[in-house]
């Protein structure tokens, strides 16, 4: 499951301040804070449009981003299976050409989901892989293209610029794409998750 933080941070901060001061929080404030945390079961409530033929544009391109070790490749694998099980033609793009074993890991997930994969040698230009994946998707009449990317720290300018290059490569053949960008976060990040979200949102 995922824990989604609502925008009502003020309630959570107020609870923290009263706890630090040794004061009672109060039932109403606690309820507000609890409502600000929404637990979403990914298996029961799809994050994205589900079912074949329900996408405004095809391929429906989903770019998956995040820092190192957050679980991007695993997320791509699970989404691929979800979409394939719903009857969609799915293709995954292995644009993490930096991490050793990243392509092999995505290969395993693609095989489990029964979907095809576009890959390149380690060290290849990830933007080129993304371009080839969109081209292949158009030729094969793919419904959903899932783009896995290398982990990158949000404060590393050159890596964030690389992400922009990937987006531009995707948009050359599919002007409205990527249609969705998913930021995968580690649930233990705390307030750093907000910093990551802001930085990735600016890309």
Q: Which functions belong to the PLM regions below?
A:
Residues 7-10, 14, 21-24, 33-36:
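Short linear motifs in low-complexity or flexible loops
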Residues 97-98, 150, 187-188:
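Conserved Walker B
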Residues 1, 20, 35-95, 102-123, ...:
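Primarily NTPase-proximal linker/entry elements flanking Walker-type ATP/GTP-binding cores
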């Amino acid at each position: 499951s995922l824990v989604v933080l609502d925008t009502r941070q003020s309630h959570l901060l107020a609870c923290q301040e009263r706890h630090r001061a040794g004061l009672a929080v109060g039932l109403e404030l606690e309820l507000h804070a609890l409502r600000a945390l929404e637990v979403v079961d990914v298996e029961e409530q799809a994050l994205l449009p589900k079912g074949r033929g329900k996408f405004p544009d095809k391929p429906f391109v989903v770019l998956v981003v995040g820092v190192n070790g957050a679980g991007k490749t695993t997320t791509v694998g699970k989404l691929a299976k979800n979409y394939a099980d719903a009857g969609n033609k799915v293709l995954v793009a292995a644009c993490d050409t930096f991490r050793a074993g990243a392509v092999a890991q995505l290969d395993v997930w693609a095989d489990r989901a029964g979907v095809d994969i576009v890959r390149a040698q380690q060290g290849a230009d990830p933007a080129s892989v993304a371009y080839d994946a969109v081209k292949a998707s158009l030729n094969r009449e793919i419904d959903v293209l899932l783009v896995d990317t290398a982990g990158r720290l949000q404060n590393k300018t050159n890596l964030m610029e690389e992400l922009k290059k990937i987006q531009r490569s995707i948009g050359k053949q599919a002007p409205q794409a990527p249609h969705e960008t998913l930021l995968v976060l580690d649930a233990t990040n705390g307030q750093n998750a907000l910093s990551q979200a802001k930085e990735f949102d600016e890309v």
